[in-house]
Amino acid sequence: MSLLTEVETPTRNGWECKYSDSSDPLVIAASIIGILHLILWILDRLFFKCIYRRLKYGLKRGPSTEGVPESMREEYRQEQQSAVDVDDGHFVNIELE
């Protein structure tokens, strides 16, 4: 029998996990944390543009109009639009000599 044949033949215990006691609470906790970390990392990579855009710009929107009567909402929209219209006329042309 050659040495190569003996090396290629695995023993039954060689393929088994050394720490096969899965009832250990530390092993269970580490497995759960590892799986959650992997799931969160995958979601972060898939949706990072949406997530970080919402974090960056989500809080900078105007005040909430929930519970405000429609007439006051329309008045607020008109004020905002008039402020934008006024700002449109304030461009300065600079000519370089």
UniProtKB/Swiss-Prot annotation:
ATP-binding keyword on record: no
Annotated keywords: Disulfide bond, Host cell membrane, Host membrane, Host-virus interaction, Hydrogen ion transport, Inhibition of host autophagy by virus, Ion channel, Ion transport, Lipoprotein, Membrane, Palmitate, Phosphoprotein, Signal-anchor, Transmembrane, Transmembrane helix, Transport, Viral ion channel, Virion
Gene Ontology MF terms in the entry: monoatomic ion channel activity; proton transmembrane transporter activity
Lipidation (S-palmitoyl cysteine): 50
Membrane topology (Virion surface): 1-22
Protein origin, superkingdom: Viruses
Residue ranges that the Swiss-Prot or TrEMBL entry lists as coiled coil: none
Site feature Essential for channel activity, possibly by being protonated during channel activation, and by forming the channel gate and the selective filter, where: 37
Renumbered residue ranges of the record's region Disordered: 60-83
GO (cellular component) term, any one: membrane
Residue positions where Phosphoserine is found in the record: 64, 82
Record-annotated site: Seems to be involved in pH gating: 41
Topological domains, Intravirion: 44-97
Oligomer and partners: Homotetramer; composed of two disulfide-linked dimers held together by non-covalent interactions. May interact with matrix protein 1.
Primary role: Forms a proton-selective ion channel that is necessary for the efficient release of the viral genome during virus entry. After attaching to the cell surface, the virion enters the cell by endocytosis. Acidification of the endosome triggers M2 ion channel activity.
Family of this protein: Belongs to the influenza viruses matrix protein M2 family.
Protein's recorded name: Matrix protein 2
Organism this protein belongs to: Influenza A virus (strain A/Shearwater/Australia/1972 H6N5)
Originating gene: M
